[in-house]
Amino acid sequence: MAEFGELEAQDGVRMPWNIIPVATKKEQSIDSEVPVSAIYTPLKPLRSQSLLLPYSPLRCRTCRSVLNPYSVVDFSACNWGCPFCFNRNPFPLNYSSVADNNLPPELFPHSTTVEYLCDSFSSPSPPVFLFVVDTCLISEELDFLKSSLFQALDLLPDTSILGLITFDSLVRVYELGFPHCTKSYFFHGNKDCTKDQLLDQLSFFVKNPKPSSGVIAGARDGLSSDDIARFLLPASDCHFTLHSVLEELGNSPWPVAADHRPARCTGVALRIAASLLGACFPGSAARIMAFIGGPSTQGPGAIVSRELSDPIRSHKDIDKDSAMYYHKAVEFYEMLAKQLVHQGHVLDVFASSVDQVGIAELKVAVEQTGGFVVLAESFGHSVFRDSLKRVCQSGENDLGLSSCGIFEINCSKDIKVQGIIGPCASLEKKGPLCSDTAIGQGHTSAWKMCGLDNNTSICLVFEIAKIDTADVVLQSQSNQFYFQFLTYYQHSNGQTRLRVTTLSRRWVMGTESLQELSNGFDQEAAAVVMARLISSKMETQPEFNPQRWVDKALINLCTWFGDYQKGNPSSFSLSSQLSIFPQFVFHLRRSQFVQVFNNSPDETAYFRMILYRENVSNSVVMIQPSLISFSFHSPPEPILLDVASIAADRILLLDSYFTLVIFHGSTIAQWRKAGYHNQPEHQAFGHLLQSPRDYADTIMSERFPTPRLVICDQYGSQARFLLAKLNPCDGDAHFSGQSNVFTDDVSLSVFLDHLRRLIVH
């Protein structure tokens, strides 16, 4: 799979089918199980800064695609042919010197991904951060949160615009521009507040009269900059005031009965935050950063009543349609999502609670705006603390936050777009590229991406038109399909840029070219696409059976590409390009994306939101965790994700993306407890203990959200974090130091045996 990694490094794209199958109208499409699709990372860092071009792109007059290496150039006539619509376009005067030995950079063969600087003369706008803080917390948790906020504020640039809102049963909007004392405006948490009501109550039109018509949006459209600066102002101007307000901030003063939950109006607070940003900074790089410590119990967006006797909804309640608050809350957050997308703003949620806070309902607003979600047990936990630090820091290890993105696609006429599964919102740009079948955000060829970073990855799903007969192949002018992805965005330095990626993939008749299709099959990308499709279908199709769907897809794919003798299971084999795919499917069936019964709706929503925005390599770790062995007998090495890998004299490091587990075998644990690693004559043992911790620290420093670290011993209570991910052994195996795992799940070998029998019979 190294060659697919090279393609990803160049263009940020991984496709399950790198040679695309085409079928006649009388045949079953091979891609009906794993669709023709692409996992694309729009802002993957370029290999060379020379591919940043300081001018505007040259576009086709007919289809608006951008000049690219696959364009056919006629130097004598000084024009170029578009590979998408075949229209010929003249070069403008500034391209008059184009020649075979004097090509512009966008025509170089390796320039399949280039970036254009769209407004080199405009002044960059500063980022805006509006903090929305839940005060219905115990004092210890609030102190943890305040400590992290102080650290975050110190990391933000002085030019960034800051604001503060707090909430319990009331919402407080702080006037940070008032220098004499702490001043805030109160809003009741029981009812929604429109933008006009908000502006009236915040006295925005005392000095300047309210416009009689038109949209009130920012200093240019009805609001004075002085009024805006009362609530949202540069960090350098409000640093002292904001620190003072946070230092004085106490937990909610309202008494809470022992059998009740606190009155928490999360929905109203977020609505007020969105309206304030929409009025003051529309279309700017603004983020609402919400810090939530429990479930919303009051006003729009509430997910449960205040009585503790009323349990928070479970998966079973949602499936049976007996979750009383769920649908109303989702409807409210869908409305909030539309408002934020229209304004171009991002919602980030940092949830820290042992209880559910409503991530399942908030999911639509966070996902459609491209926001982050972090789920931790406490505001003092490193998962929250380090993740917040990564969002706010700038420099070598930052996330590369960008904003105000618009993603568009062009492709060959026989390809239609079914949709995108990922952090974006449809712009409802209908046209000939749109398929009748919608997957995820469908029925459009353009999407809004309010927030995106260097790792944000979207899954595009395509539909390939069937041909009448195989004779059409012989008459075809070209056996290439072309795709062009265009991403407009505001860079973290304030520049507006356009990233253009143009791809070419060969197509073949599926049933006649199985070997060629097999050679171009990327099984890692296929597993990730399957995981996204399953998760999306489980969210939108109540009767969907994920195990049956994925099993059918695997059986059909292996039937197409497997080599076997009829009736002889032992003869079955797959080529190296597909040999690991059944193993991926086995682990996908057992993963948190399919098996939701052991997780809350909030946890399931959290896992899926992270899956929807991560690249292939990170997503594969979520599906099939990696296991590394550390011992005296060999250097660190990856080993099978199997119970047989446990040994008394071995340390294991499990990486399941969300959790890192350092597991000490029983002998290693005894030596550690005896303190041998502190003795000079046992330095080698000390190095052995430290080695997995160094590996884990490296992973934690590069990953977002920061994973949870669990350090445990064999036979200890927390060893369950490792054992739950391991493949159970068959029967009564006798491995040295092996733990017994009692489970209803079949082992990988039994799963593969059943697969072989089904295929050959």
From Swiss-Prot:
GO terms for biological process: COPII-coated vesicle budding; intracellular protein transport. It is a peripheral membrane protein. Keywords: Cytoplasmic vesicle, Endoplasmic reticulum, ER-Golgi transport, Membrane, Metal-binding, Protein transport, Transport, Zinc. Signal peptide: none annotated. One of its GO terms (cellular component) is endoplasmic reticulum membrane. InterPro entries: ADF-H/Gelsolin-like_dom_sf, Gelsolin-like_dom, Gelsolin-like_dom_sf, Sec23, Sec23/24_helical_dom, Sec23/24_helical_dom_sf, Sec23/24_trunk_dom, Sec23_24_beta_S. Residues 60-85 are annotated as: Zinc finger-like. Zn(2+) binds at C60, C63, C82, C85. One of its GO terms (molecular function) is zinc ion binding. It is found in: Cytoplasmic vesicle, COPII-coated vesicle membrane; Endoplasmic reticulum membrane; Membrane. It holds the Pfam family Sec23_BS. PANTHER family: PROTEIN TRANSPORT PROTEIN SEC23, PROTEIN TRANSPORT PROTEIN SEC23 C. Belongs to the SEC23/SEC24 family. SEC24 subfamily. Component of the coat protein complex II (COPII) which promotes the formation of transport vesicles from the endoplasmic reticulum (ER). The coat has two main functions, the physical deformation of the endoplasmic reticulum membrane into vesicles and the selection of cargo molecules. Component of the coat protein complex II (COPII), composed of at least five proteins: the Sec23/24 complex, the Sec13/31 complex and Sar1. This is Protein transport protein SEC23 C. It comes from Arabidopsis thaliana (Mouse-ear cress).
